[in-house]
Amino acid sequence: MSGHSKWHNIQAKKGKADAKRGKVFTKIGKEIAVAVKTGGANLDANSKLRDCVAKAKAANMPMDTINRAIKKGAGELEGVNYEEIIYEGYGPAGVAMLVNVLTDNKNRSASDVRYCFDRNGGNLGASGCVAWMFQRKGQIVIEKNDSIDEDELMMKVLDFGAEDFASEEEVFIITTAQEEFSNVREALEKENFEFVSAELTMVPDNTVKLSLEDSERVQKLIDKLEDSDDVQDVYHNAEFDEAFEG
């Protein structure tokens, strides 16, 4: 994926997070609760929970909200049991899409996701139809400022175990293997770096270059999917037109 497309995706996600902060906190809270249910509430012993908490902090989620989600997952507070489901399909212009869902009602979420695809120029596919086009990676984004030396940071993250380091318009984008994400993130935290975002994501092996019109159509489908309370993340292999602002 080109640097422009990576940074566009991050900007778009961050802009929506700022505009819909309460909804974003709810979605991250669900991830935290599921991480606790599957691996326990001890941060030291649960790397998935540590990753979720880091993601929450990068989104400026208050600690009391984070702690409440942990308690729900541990059964100390009343909560809901969520199931994780990955839907696969194609958007406009043949863009491959993965839709990550946490739901307490599979029928509702399946209906909502199918409706979004059908009404916005896409097609919901069978399991496995596009997953092979993506790899699970860690992605850490750090905002540029005068106190950060690019070469020094690049050497640090590569020493920490990162796979790739990219310098974009306003940020540095660090990519890791899934199994190295926690180690790299925690090493950067110890160096007092602050993150625009820090999360596991699905990175496409190849991208589909879009016209301005198709960029708008694909983004509309992404927006509709992300408006669903059950949808946690939407991954795709679109490379948006450089004139597209989202």
From Swiss-Prot:
GO biological process, one term: regulation of DNA-templated transcription
Pfam families: TACO1_YebC_N, Transcrip_reg
InterPro entries xrefs: Integrase-like_N, TACO1_YebC-like_2nd/3rd_dom, TACO1_YebC_N, Transcrip_reg_TACO1-like, Transcrip_reg_TACO1-like_dom3, YebC-like
Keywords: Cytoplasm, DNA-binding, Transcription, Transcription regulation
SUPFAM superfamilies reported in the protein's UniProt record: YebC-like
GO molecular function terms noted in the UniProt entry: DNA binding
Recorded superkingdom: Bacteria
GO CC terms: cytosol
Keyword Zinc tagged: no
Chief location: cytoplasm
Family: Belongs to the TACO1 family.
Protein name in UniProt: Probable transcriptional regulatory protein CA_C2295
